[in-house]
């Protein structure tokens, strides 16, 4: 196919610690190039004015934190995906910038990741802009809810309205499908995160070596830890007879007294830490994804965030892969059960086929639209 496509999500090396949004964006670039030989425009959208941009750079890019070095390495990884897949990439901050990029576009795709979370509502993430003749679809967007929550009532009315312009909708969480069908009045499909759809050799080739002398447990908790976290990891340490714990958190304090806290690592180093860990302990969706891609033993420790409300991301991906027992807390931990990686791979392959069917059916909509 030679149709011209536009993909809108977030893919921002500035936010170097949000590894999931970077990896899903790189995966989407590869997927888009597989489905068209035409022009591909990838827009990384985040609404922020000049003052916020300047403040962000002043806060993050001083040499003393180590952030700058990781940022430069991560930006290099992103540029490699842009170059290898021949992508017209832009970071945009308002609708006026976006409209300039939609000329001769036949299909617009939004996704993946949590761009539809009600706390982040912005009509741009629903492709609620541009000419009505353009086909609009979502791929693996995450709105990890099963019901309307009190703090987001007003936002859901806006979401429902924005969904009306979508021609086809796919989301990442199966548990959210009935809810989004109610909001949109349309058929909704659940599909795999795009990181599962690309050749895993791509991820192996993106790994950056870190010199770590001893076996280690990798703890990645993006949104802070609770008081029971150290008890949970202590049990993991005893199970594996490992003392070396590497902790990476993006906000909040570490509850560990005898662990090495990592400040900033590049996206390639993040992949290395997952692949080579004896065990991964995480509350991150994409750390779970890459643990399964690399066949690294892992456990999920969910840390609720009251401000963001209900969040079904972890239980949904674990259920999809038959790994529900990996979601545990400090009072409930069975480390004796091994992961059946053959069963996991079979589940991934089944869902991968279903996901590609959705993508191919979406592409066929462009052909039908051109014939009219």
Where are the predicted features?
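Active-site anion-handling motifs in enzyme catalytic cores
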Residues: 1-372
């Amino acid at each position: 196919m030679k149709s011209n496509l536009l993909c809108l999500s977030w893919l921002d090396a500035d936010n170097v610690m949000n590894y999931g949004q970077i990896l899903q964006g790189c995966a989407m670039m590869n997927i888009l190039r597989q489905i068209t030989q035409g022009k591909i425009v990838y827009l990384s959208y985040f609404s922020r004015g000049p003052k916020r941009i300047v403040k962000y750079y002043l806060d993050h890019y001083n040499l003393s934190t180590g952030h700058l070095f990781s940022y430069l390495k991560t930006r290099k990884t992103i540029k490699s995906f842009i170059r290898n897949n021949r992508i017209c990439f832009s970071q945009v901050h308002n609708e006026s910038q976006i409209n300039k990029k939609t000329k001769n576009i036949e299909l617009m795709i939004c996704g993946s990741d949590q761009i539809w979370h009600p706390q982040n509502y912005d009509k741009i993430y629903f492709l609620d802009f541009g000419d009505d003749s353009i086909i609009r679809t979502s791929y693996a967007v995450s709105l990890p809810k099963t019901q309307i929550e009190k703090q987001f009532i007003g936002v859901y009315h806006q979401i429902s309205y924005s969904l009306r312009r979508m021609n086809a909708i796919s989301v990442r969480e199966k548990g959210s499908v009935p809810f989004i069908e109610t909001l949109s009045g349309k058929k909704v499909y659940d599909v795999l995160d795009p990181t599962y759809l690309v050749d895993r050799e791509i991820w192996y080739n993106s790994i950056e070596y870190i010199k770590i002398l001893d076996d280690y447990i990798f703890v990645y908790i993006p949104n802070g830890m609770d008081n029971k976290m150290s008890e949970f990891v202590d049990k993991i340490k005893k199970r594996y007879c490992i003392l070396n714990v590497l902790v990476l958190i993006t906000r909040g304090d570490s509850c560990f007294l005898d662990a090495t806290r990592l400040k900033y690592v590049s996206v390639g180093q993040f992949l290395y830490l997952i692949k080579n860990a004896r065990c991964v302990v995480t509350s991150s969706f994409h750390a779970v994804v890459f643990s399964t891609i690399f066949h690294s033993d892992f456990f999920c420790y969910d840390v609720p965030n009251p401000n963001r409300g209900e969040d079904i991301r972890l239980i949904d991906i674990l259920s999809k892969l038959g790994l529900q027992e990996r979601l545990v807390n400090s009072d409930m931990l069975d480390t004796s059960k091994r992961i059946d990686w053959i069963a996991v791979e079979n589940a991934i392959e089944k869902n991968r086929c279903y996901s590609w069917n959705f993508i191919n059916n979406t592409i066929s909509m462009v052909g039908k639209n051109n014939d009219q």
